[in-house]
Amino acid sequence: MTTYQTPNPLRLRLKLEAGRIDIITWDEPRAEVEVTPLGDDQASIEAAQNVQQELRGSGENQELSVEAPSGRSLFGLRRGPELRFAISVPHGSSIDSTTVSADVAGRGRFGTAKVNTTSGDVSLGAVAGDANVKTVSGDLDVERVDGKANLSSVSGDLELGPVAGEISASTVSGDLHVTSAGSSVNAKGVSGDVTVESVRRGEARVQTVSGDITLGVAAGARVWMDVSSMSGTTQSDLEPDEGGGGGDVDLRIKANSASGDIRLQRAAPVASA
């Protein structure tokens, strides 16, 4: 294990082809990094020993990089040994991670999060700033985002807790589920379903080919709607006077699908803390 003195939140830059990355945030004024091989072969042991670690900067501008050596062959037919990064950093630190088939799990409170992966799953705690995640077949689960959320996936499912800022998301066969959206939503899918339990203001633009669309409208929000499905069904639980027939509206909904079903409903009331 390697320990670094980091009294302030830092930027954590990670690179790992295969394995697992576990990150926690804590109150301690230091960062700790432990690298272990997930296999007992010599190649895995040597790969763990050759991981590059470096702390750059000072004060509030520190950056800690942890990068595993590439284990791919000349034609990319063989991936590197599997390693595990176990990292602890101060609360509010930001993540910039690039992996191939490594899972990324972050618990605690982060500043911003940028994660690029191919087949690894991603789970994160609370993100105070923006969250940008790109995955091909990995699933994504984020507890909360206080900034903007920009997500893309091919076959992985996207699960988001409350998001205060704008949401931009695209999927092919993966599902998108959002607990609540505090601002505009722009979501595109092919066969995956799109569900936003609660949206109050801005613009909700959702398009799918065969995936179903479910949007919950927060209580009291006046809505303008443009909803259509060529061969699917459309259903709205909103009362006639709740639609924005004229005047000011809080939320503009444009939901379209080729064969998916579309449902608009009032969002469930938020329970008091």
Regions found by a protein language model. Give the residues of each.
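Intrinsically disordered, low-complexity terminal regions
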Residues: 1-273
